Amino acid sequence: RGSDTPARFIVLDSAPDAAEKPLVFVGKGVTFDTGGISLKPAAKMHEMKGDMAGAAAILGLFKALGLTGSARRVVGLLPCTENVPGSRATKPGDVVTAMNGTTVEILNTDAEGRLILADALAYSARFEPEILVDLATLTGACLVALGTKVAAVFATTADLDQRIRENGSLVGERYWPMPLWAEYAAPLKSEVADLKNIAVREGGAIFAALFLKNFVPQGVDWAHLDIAGPAWTDENASIFRPGGTGFGVRTLWELVRTYTE
């Protein structure tokens, strides 16, 4: 709410008239993230133009689908916004209501990505997805845990977890499996709302994934990909130059292929 630029919610559908259940992909599209009122340190804030890497990966997938003429129905949901301080900005202590009616206490405005993803995940229910996968540069905790060469995958089924990791390995994009243990969910409970948008310091990437799980349509196989590490590089090596890497595009393309054959 602090930005002068209105938020946008982009819906892409490769075959809207198809009867089959689609593969639905959700991408975090924070076009610049200052942290809001909970302001980030100045160092490396310029890299936060890359906080839309999840949404960009899905746009890359749709470009590939268009170029190859894939017949599989794919839906992309891209919640896009800036997170900046301002007179109308969300404040720590505010309570907001998500699309599915869940109330969320905002304790840190720099945990904004999970809020826009939550609404997009809830919105996906109208498409009755065969699978639901979200991509996001979601947590610094994931970057600290796994470094810059691998993304985290949190999946509700072993099959989807295996498909993502195996297809990622085919194209040089690596994923490490992470838990969605129910006993970790307790610190997300709020005394004034259904959930808090942050929990305790330790295990931050897991808490973020467990927060998102509350918004996944019932009975849908879901995976959350935290790509905070490999989505950006400072190196000038291999096929990459400093900046965004496009991580995830090739994995998603291979994943679509496995559901098409």
For every predicted segment, state its role.
Residues 1-261:
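A generic structural signal for tightly packed, nonpolar segments enriched in small/aliphatic residues
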